[in-house]
From Swiss-Prot:
Chain's gene name: lpxB
Name of the protein in its database record: Lipid-A-disaccharide synthase
BP terms from Gene Ontology: lipid A biosynthetic process
Keyword vocabulary terms for this entry: Glycosyltransferase, Lipid A biosynthesis, Lipid biosynthesis, Lipid metabolism, Transferase
Keyword Ligase assigned: no
Known catalytic reactions: 2-N,3-O-bis[(3R)-3-hydroxytetradecanoyl]-alpha-D-glucosaminyl 1-phosphate + UDP-2-N,3-O-bis[(3R)-3-hydroxytetradecanoyl]-alpha-D-glucosamine = lipid A disaccharide (E. coli) + UDP + H(+); a lipid X + a UDP-2-N,3-O-bis[(3R)-3-hydroxyacyl]-alpha-D-glucosamine = a lipid A disaccharide + UDP + H(+)
Length: 381
């Protein structure tokens, strides 16, 4: 370990990275309170003492049109960071997510003799697997949230450390379902279904009608069924309300602004789009069905690019179909409702599933902030 105070360079490109960066800085300061942190940081990282050469919002652009509009600025920032980090010679550079920006930067810094870490593996195990070779050239170490990610990197001899998942650390093994119900105004004994049609406009457009029709079918069987629908922002809420007015105008439900985790915790089952929400739902111990639909050409292309047997993280973690995945033409109200029925019923199917959810939760609950900090410090030796 260097005798001088550590200097650690970091680049975070979005809110999730800011949260991870702040947790990492906190854990590092416990071991090295005099360490210096510099780079691209959001408000949480800055509140932990990171000196921001650029604000995180400069990198937080999504979509091809937005990226093209900001390309000159993004390239300038990357060149400037390369120059300034090379002059600074930090003990280690940590690129937090934002792979399109960070992996190239990591490669340039590694060429200058600076140790580099990429924190949060891109989904190379699922598609565009050849990216693993670029990552291997650019980084000294990848920090992975999930055990199957490390197994993938091991196949290609790319140094990778499984650190557990921060979300698993944040959520209790045994959730407080009744506290979530009190917060949402749901009766303690009510039967409750959560609908989560996604966070993107295209997802809400493609999934909402089928999800609403599924809820109507289930309400015919369970007339007292409570339905909660968390929506990530006012735009998605307005979009969902417009679809509901056409498809299920008279179906009673609780529309929530945000509160996705509370909805999962409070519900007996959930119908959701794939993605991080499926992992969060597993950690909330809420049985789920994954439904997903996309434009036909996009689905055709995805089937040829994606190299995994499953799309949802619970199934990838379990290595088998733990939760039903009804994709594209299978994503139909009758089939979705049939898959949800045994999850709403209190019985052995549900109990076995919840026990497996708890086992998987333990497998990825490793205190990720401390594990990440330990990996950073080992590389500084």
């Amino acid at each position: 370990m260097p005798k001088h105070p550590l200097t650690i360079a970091l680049v975070a490109g979005e809110t999730s990275g800011d949260i991870l960066g702040a947790g990492l800085i906190r854990a590092l300061k416990e071991k090295h309170p005099d360490a210096r942190f510099v780079g691209v940081a959001g408000p949480l990282m800055q509140s932990e003492g990171c000196e921001a050469w650029y604000e995180m919002e400069e990198l937080a652009v999504m979509g091809i049109v937005e990226v093209l509009g900001r390309l000159r600025r993004l390239l300038h920032i990357r060149r400037d960071l390369t120059r300034r980090f090379t002059a600074l010679k930090p003990d280690v550079f940590v690129g937090i997510d934002a792979p399109d920006f960070n992996i190239t930067l990591e490669g340039r810094l590694k060429q200058q003799g600076i140790r580099t870490i990429h924190y949060v593996s891109p989904s190379v195990w699922a598609w565009r697997q050849k990216r693993v070779f670029k990552i291997g050239r650019a980084t000294d170490l990848v920090l992975a949230f999930l055990p199957f990610e490390k197994a993938f990197y091991d196949r290609f001899n790319v140094p990778c450390r499984f650190i557990g998942h921060t979300m698993a650390d944040a959520m209790p093994i045994v959730p407080d379902k009744q506290a979530a119900r009190r917060e949402l105004g749901i009766a303690p004994q009510a039967l409750c279904l959560a609908l989560l049609p996604g966070s993107r406009s295209a997802e809400v457009e493609m999934l909402s009608a089928d999800f609403l029709k599924t809820a109507m079918l289930l309400r015919e069987k369970y007339p007292q069924l409570e339905i909660v629908v968390p929506l990530v922002n006012p735009r998605r809420r307005a979009q969902f309300e417009a679809i509901k007015a056409e498809v299920a105008a008279d179906l009673p439900m609780h529309l929530l602004d945000g509160k996705g985790r509370e909805a999962m915790l409070a519900s007996d089952a959930a119908l959701l789009a794939s993605g991080t929400a499926a992992l969060e739902c597993m950690l909330a111990k809420c049985p789920m069905v994954v439904g997903y639909r996309m434009k036909p050409f996009t689905f055709w292309l995805a089937k040829r690019l994606v190299k995994t047997d499953y799309v949802s993280l619970p199934n990838l973690l379990a290595g088998r179909e733990l939760v039903p995945e009804l994709l594209q033409d299978e994503c139909q109200p009758q089939r979705l409702a049939a898959a949800l029925e045994p999850l709403l019923a209190q019985g052995e199917t549900r109990d076995t599933l919840l026990a497996t959810f708890a086992e998987l939760h333990h497998q990825i609950r490793w205190n990720a902030d401390e594990q990440a900090a330990a990996a950073v410090l080992e590389l500084c030796r």
